[in-house]
Amino acid sequence: MDTTHNDTTPQRLMITDMRPLSLETTITSLTRDIITHRFIYLINHECIVRKLDERQATFTFLVNYEMKLLHKVGSTKYKKYTEYNTKYGTFPMPIFINHDGFLECIGIKPTKHTPIIYKYDLNP
C-alpha cells in the first residue's frame, strides 16, 4: 500500500511549548489568589486619586502584584516565579477602560494558555 498519496497519513505531533506545566499551574493559581476584587478596587482607587495614565496604571498594577506575590510565597520561590514569568511572558497584564480621563481596570488580558479574566469573575 502506497502511503505517499494517502490523505490520512499520520502527522507528527509537534511540541513547541516546553514550559513546566506544574509551575504554570501553580503560578496561575497564585495569580487568582492575589488578583481579587479587592486588588482591582485598590488599583482603580489609585488610578482615580493619582490620575494615572495607562502606562503608570499598568506599572502600579504590576508592582502591587509583585509585592503580593513576594509576601505570599517568600523570596526563594518569588525569584523562581519571576524568572518563569519573564522567560515565558506570563505576567498578568491589566485591561483598562477610560472614563473621561479616569482609568478603570476591568480585568486581566489573556495569555497563550489562559482566557481573559474579567473582574466580575475574580474571587471576592
UniProtKB/Swiss-Prot annotation:
Pfam families (UniProt xref): RSV_NS2 (PF03113)
Presence of keyword Ribosomal protein: no
Gene Ontology CC: one annotated term: host cell mitochondrion
Location relative to the cell: Host mitochondrion
Identification of the protein by name: Non-structural protein 2
Sequence motif DLNP, location on chain: 121-124
Record note on domains: The DNLP motif has IFN suppressive functions like binding to host MAP1B.
Subunit annotation: Monomer (instable). Homomultimer. Heteromultimer with NS1. Interacts with host RIGI (via N-terminus); this interaction prevents host signaling pathway involved in interferon production. Interacts with host MAP1B/microtubule-associated protein 1B.
Source organism of this protein record: Human respiratory syncytial virus
InterPro entries the record matches: RSV_NS2
UniProt superkingdom: Viruses
Homology family: Belongs to the pneumovirus non-structural protein 2 family.
Keyword Chloroplast: no
Reported function: Plays a major role in antagonizing the type I IFN-mediated antiviral response. Acts cooperatively with NS1 to repress activation and nuclear translocation of host IFN-regulatory factor IRF3. Interacts with the host cytoplasmic sensor of viral nucleic acids RIGI and prevents the interaction with its downstream partner MAVS. Together with NS2, participates in the proteasomal degradation of host STAT2, IRF3, IRF7, TBK1 and RIGI through a NS-degradasome involving CUL2 and Elongin-C. The degradasome requires an intact mitochondrial MAVS. Induces host SOCS1 expression.
Gene expressing this chain: 1B
Record GO biological process: symbiont-mediated perturbation of host apoptosis; symbiont-mediated suppression of host cytoplasmic pattern recognition receptor signaling pathway via inhibition of IRF3 activity; symbiont-mediated suppression of host cytoplasmic pattern recognition receptor signaling pathway via inhibition of IRF7 activity; symbiont-mediated suppression of host cytoplasmic pattern recognition receptor signaling pathway via inhibition of RIG-I activity; symbiont-mediated suppression of host cytoplasmic pattern recognition receptor signaling pathway via inhibition of TBK1 activity; symbiont-mediated suppression of host JAK-STAT cascade via inhibition of STAT2 activity; symbiont-mediated suppression of host toll-like receptor signaling pathway; symbiont-mediated suppression of host type I interferon-mediated signaling pathway
Main location: host cell
Keywords: Host mitochondrion, Host-virus interaction, Inhibition of host innate immune response by virus, Inhibition of host interferon signaling pathway by virus, Inhibition of host IRF3 by virus, Inhibition of host IRF7 by virus, Inhibition of host RIG-I by virus, Inhibition of host RLR pathway by virus, Inhibition of host STAT2 by virus, Inhibition of host TBK1 by virus, Inhibition of host TLR pathway by virus, Interferon antiviral system evasion, Modulation of host cell apoptosis by virus, Viral immunoevasion
